[in-house]
Amino acid sequence: MRRWTREWTRAVACGLCAAVMVSTVACGQGAGQSGSGTDGAGNGGDGQTAADVESTGNENGQAGADGAQADAGTDNAAAVEGIVYQVNTDISGLDDSHRISDTLFGLFLEDINYAVDGGMYAEMVKNRSFEYGMEARDAQLHGWEVTSEAVEFSVKDGSADGTALNENNPQYAVVHNTGTSSATPHEGIRNGGFVEGMSIVQGASYDLSFYCKTDDGSVDAVTVSLCNEDGTVYAEQTIEGVTGEWQKFETTVTPDATEKRHVCLAVEIPAGTACFDMVSLMPQDTYKGLPVRKDFGEYLEALNPTFLRFPGGCVIEGRDEESIYSWKDSIGDGLAFEMNGEETVGDVAVRPQGKSIWQGSKAHPYYTTYGLGFYEYFEFCEALGCMPVPVLNAGMTCEIQSPFYQVYSITDEAFKQYVQDALDLVEFCKGDGSTRWGAVRIAMGHEAPFELKYIGIGNEQWQNEYHQHYRQFVKAFEEAASADPALYGDVELIVANGTASDSTEGWAYLAQNPDQITTLVDEHYYQTPEWFLANTDRYDSYNRDLQAKVFLGEYAAKANTLDAALAEAAYMTGLEKNGDVVEMACYAPLFSHEKLNQWVPDLIFYSNDSIFGSVNYYVQQMYGNNAGQYSLETTLTGAPEQTIYESAVDADGDVILKLVNVSQEEQNVHVMLTGREMTCFLPEADVTVLAGDDPKAANSFKDMAVTPQEGKLAVSENFEYKAPANSLTVIRLTALAD
């Protein structure tokens, strides 16, 4: 982030009025309670507790704190003209309605816009297992081409004669070099990666592997190289030892130059015939050793997410049975695989290729390699330090993209298998070595259990059939929890709520079935910026007496412009103020290739070698890095309607103020802090500002028009802040140690 120095971001501290008197409390009262995990009443020092004070509602639907203190603040605000932003920094009198979920801001990852295969997944070879079907251009050959006319290239299905590498990936390449090339004795096939060729870095190490055999004994060596179409070679190796049996060959290649586009991986043989499968090229420099592109992982880590919802989305629903995402397929159904004298379980080589509901391009067909499967997703959550929130199919296909969507009867064995898959996922994550799926996890290399608190059942379903299905999942989990409470007792199911901001089907179902073990209702909506600005108080009136809370599983303001991002920022002030009822919220979609976009808007854009965050990304980052445990009492007066939006939180004693100015004019805001003494904080606050002159400004590879800028601000009980036009400002007062 750049340090901000421009005149319009300058904020000065000043006394407002010598006659203003503010009520303060000792530092220990606020800091002592923060993040304590108690009932929210607070017991810092000798101050008041919630039991001492009558709770009253304010304009944000929150319970009131100390009435006398609030009255004093109101009088003080009345003495000041203009926009007044008043914050009570004392949390000792707050009740549970001010408690903010510790998983409020997170991520949702769906393989749309080529987000995973060809994107986040670090694999560089397209159609590495030769399993692309007839939907692809050139059928199974898609992604591959011969290096010269001297090569005959075909794909064989080895399932019939038992020649396949394994049962889950039956197809493999048969390459015959006729030996008629006058240019070189070695010819074969080459792969150009996903889009515009591969990107390589000089001196970087890349792990290259492939499976190979020769049925007629005519080939004993394979030459692999990184090259371009004009013949330039950046790295080359010859690997010997090919026999009549499948073997896995592994090596490392290091390019002698950097090329951002149009690099190919060539796999060549002398005159003769050889068979190939699972040809892979992956950079060694990945995110924390996982098969994740390093820049993708770092961009997500910078958001400081508390959870990750995966893998969809419509991906888990499918347009038909063939395109439904299967978590068991994503780990190769736990299949054991022996090669080169070693046995693996769930290896990528035994993961069947799946179709995607987002497959819609003949030029760039969309398949699911499952290279990033559930095992890797859970590991990725551990690396990010966030909670995994997997989503599973509910026994029916997508209601939106399937006019005649498929629904299994709850008596069908096929439906019962979907229920069993959900139970088995719990066993995979939490079971020990005595359980079937727990043993699979351990054999894959993860001895300790994975965290698992929530499972989403379905995505954007709302019909009666879905609720009938959901009821069967609930019944099965109740029975499982009764039989084995240690394994299943803590897992909670998430119920879908349709596709729009006015959808209420999930809530209506729970109202009719209050005994259901549901704690989260999954709301999804994509709206205009104007809608978000007009509905910042959406959750003020939600019923606090219900067990179920809100999971805002997908939302966005339909554009990647500054004004849309600020509308989301304004809306997020309402999420913070209602953090007692909104348990989790995540923007969607997460990633998009710059040239393969299937949905607008998106949070992060990428190419083969670069990545950038949209303006919306930086809004999420500023909130994710400035979340709190308590929503503080605030009042805002004197602001023109739908101009200034605000929230304030306590984060382990730090006080964090957020101001969103959606007008195209600078706004002078008088900030008044009551409650804790200012000696509780450092004299200067950290300030982060996201702003721009043009509300339609958007970021791109060529122009990062809007990014956060950081600075310092001297603060006092009363100070003035000039909120720039079109801006989000975060002011963080750092608490001193007691």
What are these regions (language model features)?
Residues 10-28:
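Sec-dependent N-terminal signal peptides of Gram-positive bacterial secreted proteins and lipoproteins
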Residues 22-47:
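Sec-dependent signal peptide cleavage junction
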Residues 73-369, 387, 402-416, 467, ...:
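Extracellular and organelle-lumenal recognition/adhesion modules and their flexible linkers in secreted
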Residues 107, 210, 304, 381, ...:
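Conserved, mostly hydrophobic/aromatic
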Residues 231, 236-239, 248-250, 276, ...:
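Active-site cleft segment of glycoside hydrolase catalytic domains centered on the general acid/base Glu
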Residues 238, 642-678, 687, 729-732:
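Carbohydrate-binding surface patches
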Residues 253-257, 261-264, 284-305, 362, ...:
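An active-site-proximal structural segment forming one wall of the substrate-binding cleft
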Residues 475-480, 501, 509-626, 662-664, ...:
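Catalytic-core region of carbohydrate-active enzymes that cleave or remodel glycosidic bonds
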